[in-house]
């Protein structure tokens, strides 16, 4: 049985948001804890949280979460792919497949993750109305390629140019594409959560 690891990307500056995104609260819980709980529920054994801006706050907030931390010292000047590389290095040898998510995509359905994990392929991602979402699943065999990729497009560019087996799953889960970059995005997330709860109670 393959070992499942997780990388949560939480190194960003949150420059367009007036608050620190990973620790913003939805339904009494921080965004990053929503993501951790989603991964734990999917059977992820080892989770690496990549920190940068406000490193100490995240580490204190997650002191009881049973996760590993990896620090991107150049977080203010690097793209997300560099944080991912740091997270993958910390996870090296602990996983055969890796679930990857930013810390600010907190409302993905657990069923969506189960459906993604049921698929094979070097790289698996959800598609919501033609838009690529999160989380994505990476086969550990792709890690050496990601470590040396120097082309455009970040993770997506690396995967799409590699010739690997790319598997896409059409989903009805809007939570896969609802991130949190601006105050308006956060209000949209809160409305989505409220509507989802109302529907589940019917």
Residue map of PLM features:
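Conserved N-terminal catalytic core of the sugar/cofactor nucleotidyltransferase
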Residues: 33-97
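A short, conserved beta-strand element in the Rossmann-like catalytic core
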Residues: 14, 106-107
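Short beta->alpha linker loops
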Residues: 53-54, 75, 79, 111, ...
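Short glycine- and hydrophobic/aromatic-rich loop-to-beta-strand nucleating segment
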Residues: 134-138, 178-180
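Conserved donor-nucleotide/metal-binding helix-loop-beta segment in metal-dependent transferases, i.e.
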Residues: 108-131
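Conserved alpha/beta core of the MobA/IspD/sugar-nucleotide pyrophosphorylase nucleotidyltransferase superfamily
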Residues: 2, 144, 150-202
């Amino acid at each position: 049985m393959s070992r499942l690891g997780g990388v949560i990307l939480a190194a960003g500056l949150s420059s367009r948001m007036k608050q620190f995104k990973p620790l913003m609260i939805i339904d009494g819980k921080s965004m990053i804890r929503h993501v951790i709980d989603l991964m734990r529920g999917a059977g992820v054994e080892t989770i690496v949280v990549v920190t940068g801006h406000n490193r100490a706050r995240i580490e204190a907030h997650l002191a009881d979460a049973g996760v590993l931390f990896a620090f991107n010292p150049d977080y203010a000047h690097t793209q997300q792919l560099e944080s991912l590389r740091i997270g993958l290095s910390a996870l090296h040898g602990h996983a055969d497949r890796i679930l990857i998510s930013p810390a600010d995509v907190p409302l993905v359905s657990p069923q969506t993750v189960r459906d993604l994990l049921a698929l094979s392929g070097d790289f698996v991602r959800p598609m919501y109305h033609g838009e690529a979402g999160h989380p994505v699943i990476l086969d550990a065999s792709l890690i050496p390629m990601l470590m040396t990729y120097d082309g455009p497009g970040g993770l997506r560019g690396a995967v799409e140019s590699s010739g690997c087996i790319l598997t896409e799953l059409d989903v009805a889960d809007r939570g896969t594409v609802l991130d949190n970059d601006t105050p308006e995005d956060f209000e949209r997330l809160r409305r989505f959560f409220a509507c989802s709860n109302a529907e589940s109670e019917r």
